[in-house]
Every structure is written in C-alpha cells, then in structure tokens.
C-alpha cells in the first residue's frame, strides 16, 4: 500500500505541470511566435546595438513549473540574423541548464522567442534567467528579474 502511494505521488509530480501548463513549452533550439502572459517575469526590452532590435530575457513561473525564455523583437523593416547561444536558468543562484537557440533570420516587424525546457521546482526556490543574444554579429547578455516559485 505504501509503495503504491509513493508511486502515485511520484507520478502526480510529473503530471501536474502538464495539466497546469497544457504540456511543456519546450521549443529550443528553435524560434517561434510568443504571447506573453502574467506568468512571464521579464527584463525590460533592452535596445540591441543593431538595427531597431530589442531583446528580453524572461523566467516563466507557473506554480511549481518554470522555464527560461529569450525574446527578440525586430522593430525595423530589414531582416536580421539572430541566435542565443546561452539561455540559462538559475535556481537560488545555481545554474540548472544552459541551452542553445539556433541561428535564424528574423524579418522586420516580427517578434520571436526561444523557450528552454520546463522544470519542476519547490515553492521555496527563487528563479532567474540569463540570455546571451547575438544579433547581426553583436552579442549582449540580459538577465531576467528573480521570481519565487508558486507566486
């Protein structure tokens, strides 16, 4: 009986994030359209030193599920090259992953994001993300604000 309860508890820890988030939003290493919600805790839109582009790093916290997200917005009319070789998630100041979002082209007027894997963390954990963006060959690092899980 105790064994069955432990197995059920373990299974629920794996299933709950899928129910709460509708599945994981892991799209790395590819860029995709994004719609931010109140679960996104993001840096300011940082002007990139090239061509009407802003970059932003976010940590998404939804109860005990979390992930790092990097966002690039092209406010100009010309396409730009972009990549994010480092999308890092930190738990209480310790890095838990460093993902690579592949090189791509972003057309003028578009915004794209790269979602790193979703992780389950306890409510006591404080999360933040770092993103390293390379746009048109210029690199910049941007840090998200910290966010406590379950808030």
Task: Specify the residue positions occupied by each region the protein language model found.
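Secretory targeting and sorting signals
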Residues: 1-27
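Post-signal peptide N-terminal regions of Sec-secreted extracellular proteins
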Residues: 26-151
């Amino acid at each position: 009986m105790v064994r069955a309860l432990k197995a059920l508890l373990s299974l629920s820890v794996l299933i709950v994030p899928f129910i709460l988030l509708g599945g994981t939003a892991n799209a790395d290493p590819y860029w995709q359209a994004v719609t931010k919600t109140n679960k996104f805790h993001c840096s300011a839109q940082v002007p990139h030193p090239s061509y009407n582009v802003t970059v932003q790093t976010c940590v998404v916290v939804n109860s005990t599920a979390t992930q790092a997200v990097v966002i690039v917005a092209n406010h100009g009319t010309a396409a730009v090259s972009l990549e994010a070789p480092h999308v890092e998630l930190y738990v209480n100041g310790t890095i838990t992953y460093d993902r690579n979002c592949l090189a791509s082209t972003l057309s003028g007027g578009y915004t794209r994001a790269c979602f790193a894997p979703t992780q389950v963390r306890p409510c006591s954990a404080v999360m933040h993300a770092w993103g390293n963006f390379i746009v048109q060959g210029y690199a910049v690092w941007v840090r998200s604000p910290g966010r406590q899980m379950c808030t």
